[in-house]
């Protein structure tokens, strides 16, 4: 039972890592298959399956919506940034 739990936990963590970043899985497979491997078209820089999109910092979108700002605050910000 301990082995099954350990394997399940390991596979769950591996699945979470693989879905959160495309770089880990792509880099691992590309290093195993070489520069001109069988799946080079899918894993290359211009590949269809794995790209560098997940490597970009997408945390800046967290600040795009701030629920603590009121409508008056938004109007004041729009007026301040109007000529910026």
From Swiss-Prot:
Modified residues (Leucine amide): 33
Propeptide cleavage-removed residue intervals: 37-84
Subcellular location: Secreted; Target cell membrane
Tissue expression summary: Expressed by the venom gland.
Record field: transmembrane: none
Similarity annotation: Belongs to the non-disulfide-bridged peptide (NDBP) superfamily. Short antimicrobial peptide (group 4) family.
Protein name (record): Peptide Ctry2346
Protein species of origin: Chaerilus tryznai
